[in-house]
Amino acid sequence: MLKLLLGDPNARKLKRYQPIVSDINLLEEEVSPLSDDDLRRRTAEFRQRLDNAGSLDQQRPVLDELLPEAFAVVREAGKRVLGMRHFDVQLIGGMVLHEGQIAEMKTGEGKTLVATLPSFLNALTGRGVHVVTVNDYLARRDAEWMGQVHRFLGLSVGLIQQDMTPAERRRNYGCDITYATNSELGFDYLRDNMAADINEVVQREFQYCVIDEVDSILIDEARTPLIISGQVERPQEKYQKAAEVAAALTRAAEMGKDGIDPEGDYEVDEKQRSCTLTDEGFAKAEQMIGVADLYDPQDPWAHYITNALKAKDLFTRDVNYIVRDGEAVIVDEFTGRVMPGRRWSDGQHQAIEAKEALAIQPETQTLASITYQNFFLLYPRLAGMTGTAKTEETEFEKTYKLETTIVPTNRVRARQDWVDQVYKTEEAKWRAVAKETAEVHQQGRPVLVGTTSVEKSELLSALLAEEDIPHNLLNAKPENVEREAEIVAQAGRSGAVTIATNMAGRGTDIILGGNSDYMARLKLREVLLSRLVRPEEGHRPPVPLQRSGAEGGGGFAAKAAPASGPHGHAPSEARAIGSLYPCQLTEDTDQALADLAKDLVKAWGDRALTVIELEDHIATAAEKAPTDDPAIAALRAAIARVKGEYDDVVKQEEQRVREAGGLHVIGTERHESRRVDNQLRGRAGRQGDPGSTRFFLSLGDNLLRIFGGDRVAGLMNAFRVEEDMPIESGMLTRSLEGAQKKVETYYYDIRKQVFEYDEVMNNQRKAVYSERRRVLEGRELKKQVVGYGERTMNEIVEAYVNPDLPPEEWDVTQLVSKVQEFVYLLDDLQADQLQGLSMDELKAFLQEQLRNAYDLKEGQIEDQRPGLMREAERFFILQQIDTLWREHLQSMDALRESVGLRGYGQKDPLIEYKNEGYDMFLDMMTNMRRNVIYSMFMFQPAPPAGQSAGQRTTA
């Protein structure tokens, strides 16, 4: 009703941007004739106007005034450097991002180019802009590709990669615009707040941040906190024994009801992802281990058994993790990528290692942690872009105070979404997927099949191999990941079949007819690899070499390699079928490439580069930025020449693919989130291309099985249909959407809970980190320590003096001995000196005594070496903050686990957590102050000739 009265709020927002778009279009005529140098001078003019404004808050209105001119300049730079002109809708996207909102832009609408607009504008303040992507590859690609625009306009561009040193990181964070992944930013923030010296800090104060694939980072990853941990020793044999016990226990066929245990040793709740032992299971486990009680605090076993059961039933190999080089490596459930270096916490990863009989790594203790939710809220202005945000609009608004604006597409969408087909069994579903893939492949259309796990992708690969259908496989297995860019580059070619695990965040558009630009780069890489790259790099070409059967034809080879095995050939063979390149190069071009290789050997040395260095050179040559390097210029000319030859074939192929109907996308299971389904659909029909999509489901799919409930079970029995006959039912589709909404709400509640609990920690974290930073910067250290001492004196007075009693009854003797415990230099302080003083006078007198004693101590220490006192102050404060904060994190974790049970006593666990957590925090800060004072007075530096270190004692 409101929509009818007020109109669509999104349309109203877009209308507001229209006049500014017109202004930018008018300015284009003014900016176009400018020389490159004049264009760069505009950047300096903008900066001057901002410098005159002063603080960030005063600069904001000036930025808004500059927007039309700045956007016009960036658009012109994009045309000159990248050969890409920002469309009007992309300008709108840039305005949405500048205002600190989320821009929903469909796949293929050029989100990466849009980010150049607000990042340039906000970087003019000189306070730094962060552009965040989901992986290192995308960060590097965007910094190289889009960074050209910023560099052309005179801004510095930085890039943060996983293997960089602190010095490189600091240099890159110091740039005007820095490209990085969410995890690198978060971990650098935590490491900065564990630094022992201000020179180890790499980040500067946060200002403005644009997040690409914002839903993936702020929603999908919001349940996972970032943790930096140190190792703690736990007995490995417990994990191994627990894995043996778990293997011997029997899972109950169904959940228990009304407090009555089911038949079996333990029950599994897939929805809550938990395992619980029945009474029978407890007895069995205790007997097998030989203990009286699994919960015995002296020898606890329950935690190990629960983790072992979860590892057995809830963590599946090739779905949740893969085993590689003797390690269990996590597979990201949203992107299907492996995440080396990440581990599940609380001993869960060790339980999986025991299950797989791998070497068990030591368990860890948290040293610092933060959630992405609270990390990104540290930015004064945050913005994001994605193809799918509308379904999570409420969460963005409630958690992050971010509005979502849908930016219209540049061309009308021509994609057809065909109706879902539901099969009774999983087997029938996979046969139907293979059948439809074969039919569409025969029409000469490219097909992309999205699967939810490595295991399922390999199952389909085997089915297609039986049918003799050439295809490429893209999943978390290392041999496939290395060919990722190559597989995606040819996924739009005529008759290409690509099986991919979760296409979210893949970062490369599927171009109909194939990506000739990328194929040209790969050709150069193949030619130069053996001549320029060190042999010890252990490289093998990531691309299959040209196959004789497919030369000049474009498209994929129709026939497989010679048969081997029962199904014609193994899936591993089937993957690489089809030539990568659309045609064979002419003899002249082949000769030119051979000559180029010789010239580059002279320039860069015979096999002297790493693979990464070679790829960087090729990426630089593929850019349009001006270059003085003759080797890069020659490489650039070669890429253009090869691309020109490929283009002739690719353009014809693109026309054929368009006429046949474009890319067909097949989904093989509904994901728990509608958003991930929409991301997969969005791969077809980009920028007005033709295309179609269809989802194939079975009644045994996880989503329907776990969340569909009894209604779907009833439907299963009601459908007395053949197994291979698809069911199309409105009721079923509604059940399915209901199930997805239910899951989304369920996970939203979990994230909300994570956020609410972490909010308590967040306020404490901010207080501790700001105190720590003040110490690191060495600001007024003496004043700070003396302040700690004065508060400690006040606390001693309050502990030993009861203001309700007359002064003669106060225990002044005890008070004096307590003061002397902390400050041994006050040994001559007598109780009678304090007689007759009021409580306030007592505090003032003791504070005065403490200051005098501290000056005396400072004189003694500074006599040894000037500046030593400040160093000692910094060392002891940091040591105490770090030690106590680490212990506090553990106590807060334990509190959080125990507080849940208080719900049974009609108490709100969150309020209990807040109150007790606050008290624990105050205790921690009090202990920190007291320990620092005690340590400072006990500190006895070694004499200059020095044998022993000074005492470092804590109260």
Swiss-Prot record:
Region (Disordered): 537-571
Example of a GO biological process term: intracellular protein transmembrane transport
Family annotation (InterPro entries): Helicase_ATP-bd, P-loop_NTPase, SecA, SecA_CS, SecA_DEAD, SecA_motor_DEAD, SecA_preprotein_X-link_dom, SecA_SF2_C
EC number: 7.4.2.8
Keywords: ATP-binding, Cell inner membrane, Cell membrane, Cytoplasm, Membrane, Nucleotide-binding, Protein transport, Thylakoid, Translocase, Translocation, Transport
Topological type in the membrane: Peripheral membrane protein
Record keyword Nucleotide-binding present: yes
Keyword hit for Protein transport: yes
Family membership: Belongs to the SecA family.
Role played: Part of the Sec protein translocase complex. Interacts with the SecYEG preprotein conducting channel. Has a central role in coupling the hydrolysis of ATP to the transfer of proteins into and across the cell membrane, serving as an ATP-driven molecular motor driving the stepwise translocation of polypeptide chains across the membrane. Probably participates in protein translocation into and across both the cytoplasmic and thylakoid membranes in cyanobacterial cells.
Record-given protein name: Protein translocase subunit SecA
Annotated source species: Synechococcus sp. (strain WH7803)
Gene: secA
